[in-house]
């Protein structure tokens, strides 16, 4: 699956109007494993001490990272709002060496609790998810 195929698939489900955060989980798993074939993305792995991140990323059976996904359009991917994702994100950032927070369109990478970078591969425009190829091409 390419990034464009992923975005098209996410958009098709999003436009139905009844999708939730969980609707897109399989698509993200497919994307990760397609663009980085040596990585396995396990959706809904076993709970760990700090909580239950949505995905665990493994390479040769070694845990190398985690992904926490929120619903498309989540306004707190930085985890700064006390009424948003702050408590959960702070807990994950302090316990997990590599974690990505995403709303399936925007991805924020933290290493050892420090924000490293973010990339938006698409955005919502007039109820449609539109690719931002200049950000990833």
Question: Model segments located where?
Answer:
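A short, conserved, highly charged catalytic patch centered on acidic carboxylates
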Residues: 1-98, 106, 112-117, 121-122, ...
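A shared catalytic/ligand-binding motif for oxyanion handling
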Residues: 120, 129-131
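Non-catalytic C-terminal interaction segments of nucleic acid-processing enzymes
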Residues: 131-137
């Amino acid at each position: 699956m390419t990034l464009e195929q992923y975005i098209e698939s996410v958009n098709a489900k999003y436009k139905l109007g009844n999708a939730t955060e969980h609707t897109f989980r399989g698509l993200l798993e497919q994307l990760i494993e397609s663009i980085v074939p040596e990585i396995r993305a396990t959706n809904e792995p076993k709970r760990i001490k700090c909580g239950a991140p949505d995905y665990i990323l493994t390479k040769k059976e070694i845990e190398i990272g985690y992904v926490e996904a929120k619903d498309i359009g989540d306004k707190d991917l930085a985890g700064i709002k006390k009424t948003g994702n702050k408590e959960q994100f702070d807990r994950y950032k302090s316990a997990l060496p590599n974690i990505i927070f995403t709303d399936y369109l925007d991805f924020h990478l933290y290493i050892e609790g420090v924000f490293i970078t973010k990339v938006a591969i698409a955005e919502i425009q007039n109820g449609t998810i539109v690719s931002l190829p200049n950000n990833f091409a």
